[in-house]
């Protein structure tokens, strides 16, 4: 049994395999009837998963697909994320590749100063990474009210306008969204937080519905 060694070569032989390794500057060689290659990927170099396993796989005749990040957060271009950093909210994230809906997941979204994170984002990140690697157009769409359809949510917004008459827009989303998120959504479509709820017209209600249900981010 050899431990703490670095394998740098595996050569198929007639009756098995010849394995070359090194340890403390010294090289060695052993043979075996079978080889189990479990080197990991390249996400934990300090633990040995530094990508060298791919070279060993090639020596055995395997073909490799391009390696891209998976189970990761997504960095987004929009500056507004600095405004909502630290907010966690229930939502749905959908990734689009060249305009085609490719994958989606629902759960707790984490908004950071650089973009989006959380389990749902991890689940769809590999599709985004592959699309970016292939130089395709990639964007994500966030739905902050995934339990409601567009028509249903628009009706809710209309009813809130009636109930909250007398307040201002920065109070309109109280009880629905975190204050930071509410402010960012209003800013995104150019509605002032000091505007009276009473002045919220049909067009702006529809815009609010769209931005809450179909928040596009690159």
Give each language-model segment a name.
Residues 23-34, 104-107:
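Core beta-strand elements of the Rossmann-like FAD/NAD(P) dinucleotide-binding domain
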Residues 9, 25, 42-45, 118, ...:
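Glycine-rich nucleotide phosphate-binding loop and flanking beta-alpha elements
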């Amino acid at each position: 049994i050899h431990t703490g060694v670095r394998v740098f070569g595996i050569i198929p032989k007639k009756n098995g395999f010849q394995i070359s390794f090194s340890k403390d500057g010294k090289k060695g060689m052993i043979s075996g009837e079978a080889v189990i290659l479990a080197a990991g990927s390249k996400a934990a170099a300090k633990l040995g998963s530094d990508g060298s396993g791919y070279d060993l796989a090639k020596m055995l005749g395997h073909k490799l697909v391009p390696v891209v990040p998976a189970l990761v957060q997504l960095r987004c271009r929009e500056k507004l994320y600095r405004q909502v950093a630290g907010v966690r909210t229930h939502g749905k994230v959908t990734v689009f590749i060249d305009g085609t809906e490719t994958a989606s997941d629902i759960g707790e979204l984490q908004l950071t100063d650089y973009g989006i994170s959380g389990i749902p984002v991890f689940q769809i990140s590999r599709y985004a990474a592959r699309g970016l690697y292939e130089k395709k157009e990639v964007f994500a769409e966030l739905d902050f009210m995934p339990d409601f359809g567009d028509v249903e949510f628009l009706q809710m917004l209309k009813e809130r306008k009636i109930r909250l008459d007398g307040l201002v827009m920065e109070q309109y989303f109280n009880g629905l969204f975190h204050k930071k998120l509410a402010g960012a959504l209003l800013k995104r479509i150019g509605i002032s937080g000091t505007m009276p709820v009473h002045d919220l017209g049909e067009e702006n209600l529809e815009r609010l519905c769209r931005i809450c249900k179909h928040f596009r981010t690159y």
